[in-house]
A protein has these predicted regions:
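A conserved ligand/cofactor-binding region detector
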Residues: 1-234
Length: 234
């Protein structure tokens, strides 16, 4: 089935590359940073009418995304901005990776052999559903084909075993900001729970602990474990 997007906000991601050299090394690593830029032109009509704040606000909403990384999240506005930032950085990086890969090889058929994405803690865990989205919605992969690629590309490092320290997102806020990504996570969770039921029939406590979605929360660590070919802890 085809997916159409409605009532979305378009943001341009502008890359800034920092070259990092090592001691006695002939190679240079690249650290790519991203800036969010609004795609709409400055509204001169509003400005000419004296609506200065509104004219500026229309172009500054997108730029807030990369203005201050990870603001306070003790209120819903902060949580939504933090979620937006995580998605922005993940999506921009993945689109850059795929564009570079296609430029080099002309096909995504060997993506899993040429690309490795490591989730170091859960902040970039949205790369899992976002890569699924790109493969399915943009390149017409089936679910099974896209999942096969994702689970061969992604690995994960977990940094804590304390349940209260593991990153989770409220389902309501998640659906509000990233509806398509939530749809994909829902399907990941459904398939995971079905597999867990086959392995542990009747053990609802175990399955509920391992599920990606539970108690109105999206559990990013569980998502990372479910989609990674390798997991380690530090």
């Amino acid at each position: 089935c085809s997916i159409s997007y409605e009532n979305y906000e378009t943001v341009r991601a502008v890359p800034y590359d920092m070259m990092i050299s090592g001691a006695d090394c002939k190679a240079v690593s690249v650290l790519r940073l991203w800036k969010a830029v609004d795609t709409t032109n400055f509204n001169m009509n509003l400005f000419s009418q004296g609506q200065y704040v509104k004219a500026i606000q229309e172009t500054s909403n997108a730029e807030v995304i990369s203005k201050v990384l990870y603001p306070s999240d003790d209120h819903d506005e902060g949580k939504l901005l933090r979620l937006t930032q995580q998605y922005f950085l993940v999506s921009a990086s993945l689109q850059s990776i795929i564009a570079d890969h296609l430029a080099a090889y002309g096909t995504l058929g060997n993506l899993a052999e040429k690309v490795a994405i490591h989730i170091n803690d859960t902040h970039p865990a949205l790369c899992i559903p976002e890569l699924m989205r790109i493969l399915m919605d943009v390149y017409n992969y089936s679910w099974e084909a896209a999942w096969s690629v994702v689970t061969r590309v992604v690995s994960y490092t977990n940094h804590t075993v304390l349940p209260e320290a593991l990153e989770t997102w409220n389902v309501y806020l998640f659906k509000l900001r990233l509806p398509r990504i939530y749809m994909i996570i829902e399907e990941i969770n459904r398939r995971l729970c079905a597999d867990l039921w086959n392995m542990y029939p009747g053990d609802w406590d175990r399955i509920s602990r391992m599920a990606v979605i539970g108690y109105s929360q999206v559990r990013m660590a569980n998502l990372s474990v479910a989609a990674s070919h390798t997991v380690n802890g530090v």
